[in-house]
């Protein structure tokens, strides 16, 4: 919505040409192309630029638009330089839950008044330019507030002061709402300005749902804007087309009043017939308009795709009819934020919406519905059907495994019965001690017999051992005799002839010596 306001406020043919090009791009891309693009799975860069270029205009403005805004801001600063520096800067409102309280605080407390006056808005720190300050009571086609008679918070009129371009950028960024150094720019603390009106947004939301007061006319009650939860930070500029603007008949400086196109769009959606989809309940609409997606199991994939296609087509037609019915509310005020308040021009009807913006929203909503439908069909085809096939395969595998388990169980039971009835009975009979024919009895008899034989054998072995010992002693003696005989035989073989008769020779010699000694001794004795 903020991007649409910037588009309407741009001058020249730059953004208008972009609007016409994007319009032609949307008209040249029917539903079949979008479906083919999503089914093919390839990103379409051109189509993406057609859909997403305009929503991003507010944050990615072109160089030409920024240059034009900067030139106009410099021109305005040169004209109102001295007057602007004498005034305080505008208070940055704080819309956090700490300042605006909760919905539950307002549900159990009575609201002060159904219609909040402009003085209450001044005490809360709101500017008449803010979309929430559009008073619910209209006098005529559109309220004409005197800006000079009702000064703002700082005690100055909107005619003598307009925030600079840098100040607008600071207000647009959400991070600047809670800075503690706002006082150095001459700004009031948001917590101080919202002390007396903490539940302002809650009352504003509840008042948008209540019927209008008796003093309001039918036209003015129909023109009351609904609660806008999204704050449009970009102020719309007047289009340069001569068909949408004309000077006021009285010629005096009219009040600078800004109605956001987003609030008007919400009002058109609320004032649409009951059969159309309400914008305040998107979850229920999604749940009612896509039964095939909510319950994909009850329908076949083809039926689910057809059902989602029919439901999204009906929702697209209803949104188109609601946006086309909004052309009856063809009155809007376009305000140039960089021009003095005295130079503001209004249309003859004072409330005429830009037809290009309405066409853009109609095409954008329809195209988004088509893309959502194609995305749902793509999800059904690529994810749900794939999951369904996997589920069928898993069920088949599960049945197969269950069958195998049953067969294995039956075989196990058969083995158990066979072991218990046949094998165990045979084992019990074989190991029965009382039965002489059993395996255990026969084995015991055999073992006892063999033990007796082994004992007899041991006795025989003992007697044999004794006899063997005696034989060993005899053999030892015989061996000693044999060894002596062998030594004698060896010595006989080793004796020579000299050694053999040496002893006899010695005996003879000794005998001769003895005889000689005896003869000598006898001779000596005989001679005496």
Swiss-Prot record:
Instruction: Kindly give the membrane topology term recorded for this protein.
Output: Single-pass membrane protein
Regions of biased composition (Low complexity) lie at: 1-13, 283-296, 308-332
Q: How is it modified after translation?
A: Phosphorylated by CDC28.
Protein name, as recorded? Protein HPH2
Q: What's the chief localization of this chain? A: endoplasmic reticulum
Known role: Required for growth under high NaCl, alkaline pH and cell wall stress.
TM ranges are 505-521
Ordered alphabetically, the record's keywords are: Endoplasmic reticulum, Membrane, Phosphoprotein, Transmembrane, Transmembrane helix
List all Basic and acidic residues biased stretches.
Answer: 17-36
Gene Ontology CC entries for this record:
endoplasmic reticulum; endoplasmic reticulum membrane
Name its cellular compartments: Endoplasmic reticulum membrane
- Name the gene behind this protein: FRT2
UniProt-listed GO biological process terms: cellular response to alkaline pH; cellular response to salt stress; post-translational protein targeting to membrane, translocation
Q: Where is this region: Disordered?
A: 1-52, 170-193, 230-257, 270-334
Q: Which Pfam families match?
A: Hph
Q: How does it assemble?
A: Interacts with HPH1/FRT1.
């Amino acid at each position: 919505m903020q991007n649409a306001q910037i588009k309407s406020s741009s001058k020249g043919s730059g953004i208008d040409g972009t609007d016409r090009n994007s319009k032609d791009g949307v008209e040249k891309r029917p539903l079949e192309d979008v479906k083919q693009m999503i089914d093919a799975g390839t990103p379409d860069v051109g189509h993406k630029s057609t859909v997403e270029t305009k929503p991003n205009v507010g944050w990615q403005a072109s160089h030409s638009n920024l240059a034009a805004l900067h030139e106009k801001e410099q021109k305005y600063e040169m004209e109102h330089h001295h007057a602007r520096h004498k005034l305080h800067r505008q208070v940055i409102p704080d819309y956090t839950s700490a300042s605006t309280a909760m919905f539950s605080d307002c549900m159990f407390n009575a609201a002060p008044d159904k219609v909040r006056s402009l003085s209450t808005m001044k005490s809360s720190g709101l500017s008449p330019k803010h979309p929430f300050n559009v008073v619910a009571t209209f006098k005529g086609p559109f309220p004409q507030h005197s800006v000079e008679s009702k000064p703002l918070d700082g005690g100055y009129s909107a005619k003598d002061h307009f925030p600079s371009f840098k100040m607008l950028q600071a207000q647009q960024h959400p991070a600047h709402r809670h800075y503690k150094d706002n006082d150095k720019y001459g700004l009031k603390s948001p917590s101080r300005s919202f002390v007396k009106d903490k539940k302002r947004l809650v009352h504003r939301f509840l008042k948008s749902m209540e019927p209008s007061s008796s003093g309001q006319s039918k036209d003015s009650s129909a023109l009351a804007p609904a609660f806008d939860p999204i704050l449009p930070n970009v102020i719309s500029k007047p289009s340069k087309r001569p068909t949408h603007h004309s000077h006021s008949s009285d010629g005096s400086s009219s009040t600078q009043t800004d109605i956001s196109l987003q609030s008007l769009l919400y009002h058109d959606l609320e004032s649409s017939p009951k059969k159309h989809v309400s914008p305040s309940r998107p979850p229920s609409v999604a749940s009612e308009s896509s039964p095939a997606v909510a319950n994909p199991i009850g329908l076949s994939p083809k039926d689910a795709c057809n059902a989602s296609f029919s439901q999204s087509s009906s929702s697209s037609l209803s949104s188109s009819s609601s946006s086309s019915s909004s052309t009856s509310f063809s009155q809007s005020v376009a305000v140039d934020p960089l021009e003095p308040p005295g130079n503001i021009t209004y249309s003859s009807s004072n409330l005429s919406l830009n037809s290009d913006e309405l066409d853009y929203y109609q095409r954008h909503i329809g195209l988004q519905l088509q893309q959502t439908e194609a995305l749902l069909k793509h999800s059904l085809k690529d994810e749900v059907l794939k999951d369904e096939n996997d589920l069928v395969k898993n069920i088949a595998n599960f049945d197969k495994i269950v069958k195998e388990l049953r067969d294995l169980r039956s075989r196990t039971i058969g083995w158990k019965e066979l072991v218990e009835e046949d094998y165990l009975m045979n084992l019990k009979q074989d190991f029965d001690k009382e039965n002489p024919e059993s395996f255990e009895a026969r084995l015991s008899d055999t073992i006892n017999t063999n033990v007796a034989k082994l004992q007899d054998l041991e006795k025989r072995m003992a007697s044999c051992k004794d006899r063997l010992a005696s034989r060993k002693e005899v053999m030892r003696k015989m061996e000693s005799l044999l060894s002596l005989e062998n030594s004698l035989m060896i010595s006989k073989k080793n004796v020579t002839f000299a050694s053999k008769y040496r002893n006899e020779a010695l005996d003879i010699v000794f005998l001769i010596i003895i005889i000689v000694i005896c003869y000598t001794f006898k001779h000596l004795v005989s001679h005496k």
